[in-house]
Amino acid sequence: MSKQGLTAGLAEAVRTSQPEHSVDAIHEAKKGLLDFTAASFAGREDKGIQKLLRLIEDEGGRPLVPVIGQGKKAAPLQSAMLNGFIAHALDFDDVHSDVRGHPSAVIVPALIASAARGHDERLLGAYVVGVEVMARLGESIGSRHYEKGWHNTGTLGAIAAACAVGYAEELTQEELEKAIGFAATQSAGMRVQFGTEMKPLHAGLAAQAGLLAVKLAQSEFGGSRTALDGETGFFSLYGDVEKAQHTLLNDWGAPWRIVQPGLWFKIYPFCSAAHHAADAVRQLISEETISAANTERIEVIFPPGGDAALTERSPKAGEEGRFSVEYVIALALHGHGLTVEHFSSQPIPNGVQTTMGRIQRVYDNAIQPAPHAVPKGRFTIVRAYLSDGRICEARVDCPKGAPGNELSEEDIIEKLTLTVPQEKARRIITAVEKADIKEFLAHIE
């Protein structure tokens, strides 16, 4: 990188970006916007939404921005928080392997709030820039950040959202440097909250923080212009400043991270770390006719640390089960679909809980990861020991939806039409195809 600091360098990279020149990047942004909308409408009845709506209605504010799927509007900062929560409520929103978290649930709500205030022309390009920033932050912060217990969606998302909105609203170099700092000082989110309502709120709070950071910078509020740098800066506190100096800005946009490796669009409403196992157990059910009735026990084999996000081993409700490979496998073995209704606050049936007790996690660092694995170095093997003495197993390195095994545009449209009334879905799809953001906003409320 150049001799300028990380904060100044990032601000300059954002300010001078030209993502609109990449047909592929804008195409992927449109797919991402449709998937974001599908995930948001799927989560529109989550009980946490009404709690947050009551909170902001008590506070008041100017209702300018649509709250997705609620038939209401909210003030910009409030909407960013709400829409981030809604998008991430079911863990049905996209992930990015470089981020080790959820970029769109943070970036898009902040951009929707910005667009509703008249900054809609550059939304798709700003989305590309936001994903670029968040992916590079994830790569630069290092794996130890997540392993220590930080939730990257929250800790990296605020800066990414600030950069995305800063690009959309064409901030100056000084304003961007300050906005990055204002976002960095609000960066937070702990994995101890996984399996609770607070976990998806991390996305909402990060979106809100990024939007607030831009508004503060535009208001000439005072703050550091070097918040990513030095011994007390973001990377020194949260990760590895030396690594960041080599990775944060190199080969910016070449290719754009929204294109390569790309967003991972989900077919299941639970943590992506369990998607490998879900595909594997469904394969065994289909090919080997295994079930809860004929399976004595199951081993789920990960590389060390491959299940770090799967914090729940004995969940009591489907909501906690979003982070439990035991629940996902047991649910499938009992013949249930891995669909939204099974990952709510309802208690887990006794039979499923009994089967969960026969599922054991195993870690093996001798197994060679596949070159095409997503995320890099990851795999899951599901090995079933059957009552007739057979042992059968299935290995998945790149689950359905992940880059390299991605969902088609038609798959994403189907995901949207399953959660949105047909006419509304048609209007949303047309608006996104035409990059008509005003029309898009008119139909997501």
Curated annotation (Swiss-Prot):
InterPro entries: MmgE/PrpD_sf, MmgE/PrpD_sf_1, MmgE/PrpD_sf_2, MmgE_PrpD, MmgE_PrpD_C, MmgE_PrpD_N. GO terms for molecular function: lyase activity. Belongs to the PrpD family. This is Uncharacterized protein YxeQ. It comes from Bacillus subtilis (strain 168).
